[in-house]
Each structure stands twice: as C-alpha cells, then as structure tokens.
Amino acid sequence: MWSLTASEGESTTAHFFLGAGDEGLGTRGIGMRPEESDSELLEDEEDEVPPEPQIIVGICAMTKKSKSKPMTQILERLCRFDYLTVIILGEDVILNEPVENWPSCHCLISFHSKGFPLDKAVAYSKLRNPFLINDLAMQYYIQDRREVYRILQEEGIDLPRYAVLNRDPARPEECNLIEGEDQVEVNGAVFPKPFVEKPVSAEDHNVYIYYPSSAGGGSQRLFRKIGSRSSVYSPESIVRKTGSYIYEEFMPTDGTDVKVYAVGPDYAHAEARKSPALDGKVERDSEGKEIRYPVMLTAMEKLVARKVCVAFRQTVCGFDLLRANGHSFVCDVNGFSFVKNSMKYYDDCAKILGNTIMRELAPQFQIPWSIPTEAEDIPIVPTTSGTMMELRCVIAIIRHGDRTPKQKMKMEVKHPRFFALFEKHGGYKTGKLKLKRPEQLQEVLDITRLLLAELEKEPGGEIEEKTGKLEQLKSVLEMYGHFSGINRKVQSTYYPHGVKASNEGQDPQRETLAPSLLLVLKWGGELTPAGRVQAEELGRAFRCMYPGGQGDYAGFPGCGLLRLHSTFRHDLKIYASDEGRVQMTAAAFAKGLLALEGELTPILVQMVKSANMNGLLDSDGDSLSSCQHRVKARLHHILQQDAPFGPEDYDELAPTRSTSLLNSMTVIQNPVKVCDQVFALIENLTHQIRERMQDPRSVDLQLYHSETLELMLQRWSKLERDFRQKSGRYDISKIPDIYDCVKYDVQHNGSLGLQGAAELLRLSKALADVVIPQEYGISREEKLEIAVGFCLPLLRKILLDLQRTHEDESVNKLHPLESHVHSLLSVFRYGGLLDETQDAQWQRALDYLSAISELNYMTQIVIMLYEDNTQDPLSEERFHVELHFSPGVKGVEEEGSAPAGCGFRPASSENEEMKTNEGSMENLCPGKASDEPDRALQTSPQPPEGPGLPRRSPLIRNRKAGSMEVLSETSSSRPGGYRLFSSSRPPTEMKQSGLGSQCTGLFSTTVLGGSFSAPNLQDYARSHGKKLPPASLKHRDELLFVPAVKRFSVSFAKHPTNGFEGCSMVPTIYPLETLHNALSLHQVSEFLSRVCQRHTDAQAQASAALFDSMHSSQASDNPFSPPRTLHSPPLQLQQRSEKPPWYSSGPSSTVSSAGPSSPTTVDGNSQFGFSDQPSLNSHVAEEHQGLGLLLETPGSGAQELSIEGEQELFEPNQSPQVPPVETSQPYEEVSQPCQEVPDISQPCQDISEALSQPCQEVPDISQQCQENHDNGNHTCQEVPHISQPCQKSSQLCQKVSEEVCQLCLENSEEVSQPCQGVSVEVGKLVHKFHVGVGSLVQETLVEVGSPAEEIPEEVIQPYQGFSVEVGRLAQEASAINLLSQGIPEIDKPSQEFPEEIDLQAQEVPEEIN
C-alpha cells in the first residue's frame, strides 16, 4: 500500500524513474527513455555536455510488487520525464542491508505487502527525508480493519453498520457475544442475518457471510483467490469462537463489488467485478484474467475517493465500494494498488505521478518546469464504449417453476396461548399475522404439542373437535425435521366475535361471542429440482435473447443480453415476491442468466430483491375485492347446476368467447356429473395408495422430492374430505388443488402406475381451465378491474422503466405470483391496447391468447424497447415496443393440441426487405431439414401482403450478417424442442458462417425442428478453443439430439448440481411468441397511463367524501392519485446525522440507471401497502443527452433554456460555481446542507413554511383551470401538444406556478431574504419537462422570472467544485412529467423523486442551501 505524507508541510506530489535492479544498487540508475536510440545516447556522452540534474525516484517494495506488470508499465512511462530517474531497491537489500546502506533517493515510493519490513522503510525515510508518495506511518493503520473503520468514520465516509468484537483477556467488556439462530448480538448491537464477519487483521482474507435460515442458512466463506475460486459455500451457520472480528451488516449489491483505484485526490478509476460472495467462481476471460467491468463513479463517489486518499495520506490507493440501496459504502481500504490491464490507466497514473513529483521537487533542483495545462484535466476513465445497441430495455415477467402441490388447512383457535403469540408478534396492529421464520414456527409447534398433551390428559370440551386438526398441524410442522421458512407458513386472522359469526354476518349485539383466531397453515409449494432446472434453462436462454452478441462472457459466445452494457450487472434487477418458490426460481434464473455456479442461497441473498418489501408485487391477496367475491359466487353457482351447459350458460360463463374456455366447457358438459366422476376417481386413487402401503415391497419406496406414500395419501385424503361437503355439494375452490396434485403425480410419480390418474388429469384440467381464469373475472370489465387491482404497482413499474430507458439500457426480471401473471395478461388483452378490428396482428395475438388454456410454470411476458437512432427524437418512430409471450412449460396434454402462435418477431413477406437487412434475427436461423414438418406453417397462415402488415422489427445495425453465435442451452424432443423463440418464417438460405449461424435451439424456429444439447458443445468449444465448422453440424440429427421421453428432456439429470432424484422428467418450455412487434412507445405509455388513471380515478371518487371531510383545504398531490390527508407541519431543521453534509445517495450505476434497484411508491392507497420507510435509493446519470433545468447562477439571473431536439445545453461538468440541485435526495438527509450555512438557514425555513401551504392546494383534475394564465411574471414557452395528458399537466404547472408567484408577491419581505432566489426554484421543480421520450411531447416550460435574485456567495460555497448532475435532473424531469400525466407515484427504485408537491416545496430550498 502506498501513502502520501507531505513532509514538513509540503504538498504531496509524485515523480517516477526507472533504473538499477538488485545488482546495480550502489550506482544511480539511468533514466530509460524509449524514444532515444543507443547511438543518440552515445553522442550525448561524447559531447560531454554537463549532465542535467536528475530527480531520483526510489521504489522500495517486495520484488513481486516492484516487478509486477502494472508497476513496470507505469515506471516505463515515468522514465519519459526528462528529469526523472527510477531505481528499484532489490528485495535482498531491503531485507538484509541496514538502511544506512540503502541508495539515497529524492522521492520514495514504498508500500507494505506480505513480508515487507515496514519498520526499516520508516527508519529510512527518517534518515534520508525523501518526498513520500504514500505515507509510511499510516500503513500501520491500514493493516488493522478497526483503525481503517475508525478513520473512515472520522472522515464522515459512509460505512456499513458495524460492531467490533475484541477477544482480549485484558478487556473482557469488549467481548460480549450473544448468538441466536438468525442473529448475533455484539456488545449490545444486534445484527440479523445476513451479516458479515471479518477478521480485524487486514491481511486475513477469511471473511464469512452468514445467511438467514429463511434463505437456506449456512455461510459463504471468502478467501484470497485460489485458482478459479474465491469463496465456498458451507452449511455451517455458527460464528467463529476464537479471534477478534468485525461484524457488519450485509449489503445487497446485485452481485458486484466496485474497486476504486485513486491516483492523487483528483483521479479515480473504478471497475466492477463479480462479488466473491455470489458463487465463489472467479470469472476469467480468454487470457485467464479476472473479468472486470468499467464503471462510472458519481460525483459523490469521486469525493469519497478524494477523502480516502487524503485521510490515509496515500497518493496511490485502492479501496472497495459497495453500491446498495442507492448508497455507496466503503468496506475496505487496501492502500497501494494498481489497475491491471488498462493502458489508459497506466498513462494517466504515470502522468499524474510524474507531474506530482516534478511540481514538488523541480524548484529545489532549479529544473525549469511548467506543468502542462492539460495535466490536471485527466478525464475520469469512462466505460468501455462498445457500440450501443438498439435494444434499450427488456422487462420480463416470469412465473415460478415447477413446484410441489400447495396445501393448506384452516382451523379456528381460541386458546389463550395462541392469543399471546398473536400479541407477541404484533398481530393486533393489523388484525393479521404471518409467521414464517423458524423460531416463530417453533413457537406454534410448542403450543400445539402442549395442547395435544393436555387433551390426552382430559379429553372433552370444545377442543375435542380440533384434535384431528391439531394433530395435522403438529405433523406438518414436524415434517422435515428442521424448519426452513421456504417450506411452511402459518397465517392467523383475528375475529372479534368468532369466525362463524363474522362470516355469517350475525349481529354481535344479540349474542356476545368470544373472539377467536382463524389459523391457516400453508405448506408445500416448494420449487422442485425440475423447477430449478427450468428456471436455469430459461436464464441461459435469455442470455442469448439479444442477437448480435459476439462477446465472450465466461466462455459462452453470443451472450447478447449481457452485452447490452459491460456493467450489465448493475442494470439487471431481479425482483421476486416473498414466496420461497418464487425467490428460488428467481435465484435459479439468475444463475442461468449470469452463468453462475454453486448453491442458490448466496445467489438468492445477493441478486434477488424481495419486491414485497417495496410493494412492487403487492396485492392485498388475502382480502379479496368485492368484485372477486361476486365473481367467485357466480362461478360457484353456475358450476353447481346438475344439467348440461345450455346456450345461456355459455353466455354467462364465457362472455369473452375464449376458445380454450369454450373447449373446456364442451368437455365438461354437465359440471356436477364431472365433479362426481372426479370424486370417484379420487376415492379410487386413495384406495390404491392405501393398498400400495400394505405391500411390503413399498416399505422403502421413495417418491419424487423425498415424498413418502404416507404424505401422498395425506395429500389426497385431505382433498377427498374437502372436495365433497357434508351437504353433498362440491367445493369448486378445491378444483385447482386437485388439478395441481394430479398433474404433479402424473409428471413426477408416474412410476407408481396409479390407475385412473390420466382420466382424473383430463377431467380436472377441463374444470380447472374454467375455474382458474374465471376467478380473475368473467366479463371483460371484471377481468380488467380485478387485474388492475392485482398489479397496479407492477404496471406503474413497467411504465416507468419504459419511460426512463431511453436514457440507458436496463434489464428487469420480475418473478411474481400466478395472480400477477394472469392479471397482467388480462390488462393487455382487455385494456384496449389496440383495436383488433383495425390491426390484423393484434387480432391474431388475441386469438392465440384465447386458445391458451393454462398459464403454466415459467410463463413469460416479455416487453422489449428498441430505439432507432436514425429517427427524429420526437417522432413516434424513434422508440418501438415489442410484446412477447410464452405460456411456460409444456403440459402433459398431447402435442397436437397446443395452439400455434405467430412465431417470434414475424417479418413481412417482402423479400427485398429481407435481403437488405441481412443481419436480422430471422435470417440467422438456418433452414430446416426438408423432412421435418413445420407445425406453425401448417396451422397458421402466412400474413398477407398489404397495408395491414406490421412494420419489421427494428434490428440491430452495427453488426455483420450472420454474426450470431448461439449455443442452444437445452436438449429436447424433436418435434418442438425447447426454444426461446419460435418463428413462422419460411426457411431462408443457410449462411455458411460456422457455428455462429447455427442458432438452432434458441431462436430455433418452428422452422427448425429441434435443438442441440449445449453442455457438450460448450465443453467442446471451450476445451478446443475453436468454432465448430458448419460441416460438423451436417448430421446434427444423429450427433446432437438427446433421446426424449414423451416430450420431456432428461438432459440436465446428468448435472450433479441439479439434485435429481431418480430420472424425473423436466418438461420443455414453449418458445416465446410475438404478440405484437409494431407498437410505439407513445402507444404503450398512453395505454398504461390510461389503465392506471382509470383505476385511481375510481378509487378517488370512492374516497372523495371522506377526503373532503377530513382535509378540505388540501388536495391530492397530483390529479390522478387517490386522495389522502397530507400532514405538513412546519419544517424542522433536523439534527446533524452521522452522514457528511455533502453526502448524496449515489446510484447503483451511473452508466445505466434504468433498472431501478428497489421500487418504492408513495401511493397512499391501502390496497398496496408500501414500506413506510422512505427509500434511500437514488439514481444519478452523469452522462446524459438531455435538456437541463433552469439553474440560477450568480450574476446571471435565470438562464433560459431553449427546447430543441437533441441539443445538449451544457456539459455534465458545467461549472464549479453552479450548485447541483439534488432533488432526488431522500428527505431524511436534506437538512445537512442547510446546516453548513447556519446564517441563512433560518430564512430558508421561513420561506419553506410559507411555500408549503399553497403548494398543497394543487387542484384536482376535475377542477383544472382551462384558461391560460398570462401573468407578467411568467414566460410560457409552449411546445405543440400531442396527447391529452400533456395539456392537463401543463395546466397543473401553470396553476402551481401562479400560486408560487402570488406567494412571492405577497411575501415580499421574506422573498428578499438571502434564500429567495432558491425558493423560486420550487416553481421550476414542478415544471420539469420530459427529455427525449420518442413521441411524448416535451412539456410546457414555465419560468418563474420575476423576483429571481442571485444566490448569495455563502450559499454556493459548500458546493464549489461540484459538477452539475444534468443526468439526474433529466431523469427527474422525466419522472415528474410522468406524475403530471396522471400516473401517481410510480414505484421508482433507485431514484427517489419527491412524493408530494408540498414535500417538494419543503425540500428544494433546503437542498439548494
């Protein structure tokens, strides 16, 4: 490590020279000047010119470091300075010679590494007093993590929350450790798992991360890289008991660490690498070097780099950053370290060090030296500029994989122990309680055992009826011998007058009933090994979804999606609901997508965000809406009729005329008769299982996923009991469970050969195909109402991602519950996205969707956004959206019955166009062997030529034709194997470009009949390091097809990590079908806005009366959001927090902030509970093509910005004089800048109070003022509007700005206070405008011109040297414009914008101060 100490008050600077090695130590080395030849040097000597004075730079470090490649590269460049000579002290001299014998030097670069005698180096520096590049005394501190953390804390640099456990016999009070199952308490500080345990010595790299039992438990053990491993997963969950450690909070970082390399206080290079905690496998490129991804640092992170550099007095210094929740935390300081393999960095580093040394020492040597003007302006190293592709954003909504049957049991409990447990865990706050954690489930089990013991002693009384239920509760909780929150959960709901009375609506006054709890035990529903394989396969397939990827990522060619951006890990966001199977599916998907290895637990903890924490996948599923209750009642009524379906039943049950629904009703005919048959088949099934249990040969029979015959019988006999009620009527709600169970047994336990199972599957599927989709609404209106109720936050999230990704690329993966997938599809089908009578492609898509009977596991809805750079930024042609869909894994029904889609990205039949665009994806798919029938071509006609044709998909330009390199990631059956994409294009000629053109498998089309098994090919390609020639693929039928059994692939059974029991079959997944590929961004945005607005309008009307009575003076924060009371007390200046005043929440990546990292929303609607804590997420984009904001600069008043197409109004780093408007800063922290300038914070507070009231009175949409207000204080520049929402928002803008101006006029005394120029910014905040969103027109820009005074000098002072963060403003402009278009509080990860307009009024003045 290197430190810079300024000896005797000198400023720290550095110069380098290259010279003698070990053998030539006594003499001064000769400066190496590569540009001079030997003869020129000889001529110089012959002329006997007096030698120029030379500054000698000594390198004092271990040989391994001083002769390393980066050091050699930098020293060679340093020697190009005419007056610098470098000498390297040999290791022998350093270790064995006394310091008096060391050669003298004027400047010393010395740093500690293993075995280095730091004491001697310190003694040498005292003896010779050279100029030190890296301070030596501070290097003692860097070796102790406790000291590093102490110094960082003193400097106000953000750290993860931590506690030190010193096991020192002399100080026993510092060694208080209490370990629980899922947490540890260190000296009073509690750290719930996951947490990190670091040895106090910085030289000890054995860092352990402990995982919570809900994610599978165990720990990840990190160590210094050994070969290709940097960590290993261990099932051990107990912390180490010897040695001193630092315990700190685990930061969820999307699976990357950012390494920052500072050279002096003004230069920092950053790289991201895969976190060793993820799977422990080191990613290496073709040369065997660890793969790193360049990263852009934010202004805040550059400031952190400067602080670290100065605090530790190390000119050359490396440290580790964790980017989590929109913040950047320093977790390690490494001292002296160089970037590897970056020529740009070597040049910059040598230049900075040379200039530093010359600036410091040239005056002493009378060397004429003037620093080159550009020397200090070395640019921050940008990301690798790889050509920006047209694909801007991919949002995929994916259902979880294959799972065990879900089971549940309800029981009413009244025992005081259950009430005590309910109270203990805070159930009375909401009246509901969900218990999932192991210790909570253990408490339930303890109570159950106690009650059963009491019942044995004294049977009788009311509890007697529940003995069976208590027994079942006990057996389920004891089922696996250990608890994992992923398996089971207990929900309890409080009923003040008993469950029965509450449900039957009895009058509680008439009879006083005792309160009771309804206990619902849910178990099963675990992801099976097959489900895990499906998710991994799909992840691998997604990797190649984007054509044109020639990049080599971890040995896989053609990783298109990953090439969206070299820092793709920062853009990839994977959200999952809190269901264990959903989280595990998401982790397995991430594993496949990112080519990870090993256990799922570390991947789950690092990569998968729980979307329930922020409400993204929330829906109040437990309490059904009134509409759902009505629908369920009608559905049950229709299906209880013991008569064949008549025409009126078809009208009542299938008003949408869905093909699959009509087909199922035809199969059913008489619903009660079918239920009778189903019940008889279930009875027969349980009888067969009981017989099998009597058979001595079945004693040790293991079913799939470790199930036993007893458990299987329990599953079926419970359904048998519950399906037919005592009255003889059937419980229709059990039909999905019956289908679930029989599907599972036919697929996984077929070896039992149970008779009647196939018939039971056929009948239950027919019933389920009616019940499941119709539970989400029977008529179009009901379907839409229920759908939006389920997935409103999800819709807002999708809309927001689409709106923001024209700025940078993003990849979002959402893993929701089944209800969200059904609902989202309903929104697209019934919400009126397009008029199917006018659009032939959409009509075909709707026909296809209506023919799909089941949204099976791994169903995908994929939205892709493209940008055409050749189009005008404001035209509708600029941004283009495609909608794709796959119904998930193939069911067990016959192949022929599957509906045929339109193929993946179907193109028009204009051959000329096909020829000109040779790089298109379809052309990359090879022709099909002539003997293979084309299912899609036979069943779906080619689209006719003519005006109704959709436009061709925009395809990626900058790439060669046929450059696609794809290896199919699965093996599958011949007639329609696993393909990510299907296509109904006619076969085109095959291009002879090696394996690259053989994109069989993945995009394999219906045109191509199968896919080959990737693992073998990948291994082959990797070991032989070459592409397979086309000839080698001629006989791919014989070579590469894996025998398939009944459409199920067994390909992954041979993978040891997949944990297959026996040889279970993994169903293949239907390829993606394109629903539409000619949508404009404007169409989709308008559609989603309309749906959200309709829903919130309805809610607003429902609660309007309540709202008016509660708070008539305050209107909602924007026209379409559900009204709610806004409490805004006078703004208090907060206490100074530990965070430094300059701190702003940094992004998870500046380069690409499109994929929000943790969506939050402030929707007050109780149906979507969002976390109460304000998120600390915020995204900044430093490089932006965007329009800026009005910024007040001293002496210039308000600068007007013209609104022009792509014109950049000012550079991202415009001027150090302009204070950045950090509007996205969380309001917890905004007071800090104010405290920096105490003399003006008071007026600012006054004016905020004055401003907050008018800004709350934003009119509701119904009261929008229509007339244009023409006030002398406003300059309104109107841009032609295209859409209605724009007009509405401009009216809103005008209204707010009128009030702000009015306020300014009325409070002239306050306005004349020093802060007045700042408060006027509030008006502008409301009037930010949209940037570059294709067809969405830019908003009216309203400039509050009148009393704009200059910002006084002292206001600006704290912000000297900051760059204006244009990107952030542009993003917020986009975001706030969305708000004004009527999408209330879009849940917006990683970039908070103020929740209510009155909050904006309060925040902005403070922040600018």
UniProtKB/Swiss-Prot annotation:
Residues 981-996, 1110-1119, 1163-1178 have a biased composition (Polar residues). Residues 1144-1162 have a biased composition (Low complexity). InterPro entries: Acid_Pase_AS, His_Pase_clade-2, His_Pase_VIP1, His_PPase_superfam, VIP1_N. Signal peptide: none annotated. Disulfide bonds: none annotated. The C-terminal acid phosphatase-like domain binds PtdIns(3,4,5)P3 and InsP6. Despite its similarity with the phosphatase domain of histidine acid phosphatases, it has no phosphatase activity. It comes from Pongo abelii. The modification Phosphoserine is found at S920, S963, S1013, S1049, S1121, S1128. This is Inositol hexakisphosphate and diphosphoinositol-pentakisphosphate kinase 1. Substrate binds at K64, K65, R224, K225, K259, R273, S337, F338, V339, K340. The lineage of its organism: Eukaryota, Metazoa, Chordata, Craniata, Vertebrata. Pfam families: His_Phos_2 (PF00328), PPIP5K2_N (PF18086). One of its GO terms (cellular component) is cytosol. GO terms for molecular function: 5-diphosphoinositol pentakisphosphate 1-kinase activity; ATP binding; inositol hexakisphosphate 1-kinase activity; inositol hexakisphosphate 5-kinase activity; inositol hexakisphosphate kinase activity; inositol-1,3,4,5,6-pentakisphosphate kinase activity. It is found in: Cytoplasm, Cytosol; Cell membrane. Belongs to the histidine acid phosphatase family. VIP1 subfamily. It is an enzyme of class 2 (transferase). It catalyses: 1D-myo-inositol hexakisphosphate + ATP = 1-diphospho-1D-myo-inositol 2,3,4,5,6-pentakisphosphate + ADP; 5-diphospho-1D-myo-inositol 1,2,3,4,6-pentakisphosphate + ATP + H(+) = 1,5-bis(diphospho)-1D-myo-inositol 2,3,4,6-tetrakisphosphate + ADP. One of its GO terms (biological process) is inositol metabolic process.
